[in-house]
Design a protein with these regions (language model features):
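Generic preference for hydrophobic/aromatic residues in regular secondary structure cores
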Residues: 6, 22-23, 34, 80-82
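Short, compact, well-ordered microdomains
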Residues: 63-102
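Broad, structure-driven detector of short, well-ordered beta-strand segments within folded domains
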Residues: 17-28, 38
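Intrinsically disordered, low-complexity segments enriched in small/polar residues
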Residues: 2-3, 48, 70, 86
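Short secondary-structure boundary micro-motifs
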Residues: 8-10, 21-23, 57, 64-66
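Acidic, aromatic-enriched beta-alpha/helix-loop junctions
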Residues: 28-74
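Short, extreme N-terminal segment that most often corresponds to the first beta-strand
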Residues: 1-20
């Protein structure tokens, strides 16, 4: 099971930028599922978390299947930054301190 740790900045015209930090599990070359995800506000403060089908705090629930990070170049409003697993875990630890129920 190959995993991808990514920061996704989605720009929504007239609204702003949505920031998600995701732990994705590769299904195939085009598709992943979301294992865990964090949502950040524009000040990069963690506002919510998603794990095991559960949302805590302020976060949008992810779709069952999401595009593979390698395909994000096809989406003009999405910027993706790959993270090391350690970087992701540090952010998840910060979220767990804020939301102990995760």
């Amino acid at each position: 099971m190959k995993r991808h740790f990514v920061r996704i900045d989605l720009t929504v015209p007239g609204v702003g930028t949505l920031i998600n930090i995701a732990d994705l599990v590769e299904v195939d070359a085009q598709t992943c599922t979301v294992n865990r995800m964090l949502e950040l506000d524009p000040n990069e403060t963690i506002t919510g978390a998603y794990i095991h089908g559960r949302c805590v705090g302020r976060i949008n629930e992810p779709q069952a299947a999401v595009p593979h990070p390698d395909s994000y170049a096809d989406f003009p409003d999405i910027e993706v930054t790959r993270l090391d697993p350690e970087e992701y875990e540090a952010l998840w630890t910060e979220a767990a301190a804020k939301f102990p129920e995760i």
